[in-house]
A protein has these predicted regions:
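Extended, well-ordered alpha-helical scaffold segments
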Residues: 1-15, 71-89, 134-158, 205-219, ...
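Helix-terminus loop motifs that line ligand-binding clefts
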Residues: 2-68, 72-95, 273-305
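Aromatic- and histidine-enriched alpha-helix N-cap/loop-to-helix transition segments
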Residues: 3, 48-56, 77-80, 112-124, ...
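Extended ligand-binding clefts on enzyme/binding-domain cores
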Residues: 14-39, 114-119, 141-252
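Short linear capping/connector segments at secondary-structure termini
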Residues: 27-29, 101-109, 170-174, 234-236, ...
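CBM-like carbohydrate-recognition segments
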Residues: 31-32, 242-253, 271-333
Length: 333
């Protein structure tokens, strides 16, 4: 599917802001779409963006190049897409913390420097450095890798909460003048864990990753469950069916757990989650955003492309590890 991938990169290039970032949403012709993100936070005028959306495109291009070795695409998109994006990310760094400045989070709700967005920015700058090296731009490669190293180093001390044995959702400076006085959000958020391990911000064998997964199990898993259906974060109120529940399960977050199992060689545990998702999938193959935790009825958007994509992503990784799974996944899906 290389032509589709290149068409996506071309679309991103069309809508790229002159400062090197992507806006929250776009219309089909590449014009900025509607957004509910405010331009003013406190007394500051800010770009109403989610930095992870910019970062993930650079990371994806790195994955594309690693898989295809497409020099022609790299030479075309490096000056017009990769370099502007990487330059923006490398410049959009808090000089005190060495972490990215706050932007809106991936759930489109909070203005924070989140663990998730930090992880994606880190991985994107690593990828950008390798792409720069591939086109002979040594100065770019060294600079972006150095910024990535600073981010990873700072994350070890600023983004893990030992009191909760979990990653902070994020933090924000208390005011524009409070350079070192920061306010943490310690909500247990699945995206914080996913970002930390999937994008290499923390080592897979680190105590932070291991203890954080134990915390997820303690907070979200009932004693009689084989699969831990995951909400976005604790006490998520979006479309919550029961005020006493911790939140509705989301397919994407539950599948992130399966991806963690695959990364830690627990294929059978991952397979149980894939089976759990398939058992709730419509006969048409459609997945929703969320489900009712008691009746398993679909809630909110269906189909949700993100849910579909995470299922395919997880199933492909599972098939790669266990080829015999292919026949059952393709037959049942």
């Amino acid at each position: 599917y290389t032509s589709e991938t290149l068409a996506f990169f071309d679309f991103c290039r069309t809508g790229l802001h002159e400062d090197g970032y992507l806006m929250h949403k776009y219309q089909p012709d590449g014009a900025p779409g509607s957004s509910w993100h405010p331009y003013i936070v406190g007394n500051r005028c800010i770009a109403p963006i989610q930095e992870d959306e910019t970062a993930i495109v650079v990371f994806l291009f790195g994955q594309y190049y690693d898989m295809t070795g497409d020099k022609q695409a790299l030479e075309e998109f490096y000056p017009s897409l990769i370099k502007p994006m990487a330059t923006f990310m490398a410049d959009y760094i808090d000089e005190v913390t060495k972490l990215p400045h706050a932007t809106y989070d991936l759930w489109e709700e909070k203005f924070l420097t989140t663990t998730y967005s930090t992880a994606v920015v880190y991985a994107a700058l690593v990828a950008a450095g390798k792409l720069a090296e591939a086109v002979g731009e040594a100065d770019d490669a060294v600079h972006w890798q150095a910024i990535a190293d600073d981010i990873r180093r700072a994350s070890q001390t600023l983004l893990y909460n030992p009191d909760k044995a979990f990653f902070y959702k994020g933090y924000v400076h208390k005011s524009a003048d409070a350079k070192t006085d920061i306010m943490y959000d310690d909500t247990i958020d699945m995206s914080s864990f996913y970002g930390a391990f999937m994008f290499g911000l923390f080592d897979m064998e680190s105590d932070e990753i291991k203890e954080s997964f134990k915390t997820l199990q303690r907070v979200f898993m009932a004693s009689d469950q084989e699969v831990m259906p995951m909400p976005r974060y604790e006490h998520d109120q979006y479309n919550r069916v029961d005020e006493e529940s911790i939140g509705n399960p989301w397919f994407i977050c539950t599948l992130w757990q399966a991806q963690y199992f695959l990364e830690t060689d627990r294929q059978q545990a991952a397979r149980k989650i894939v089976d759990w998702v398939q058992s709730r999938m419509l006969k048409s193959g459609v997945l929703s955003e969320q489900i009712n935790p008691y009746t398993h009825e679909f809630i909110s958007v269906a189909p949700l492309a993100w849910s579909q994509a995470e299922f395919i992503n997880t199933a492909i990784d599972l098939v790669t590890d266990e080829p015999e799974v292919l026949s059952t996944v393709s037959k049942d899906a």
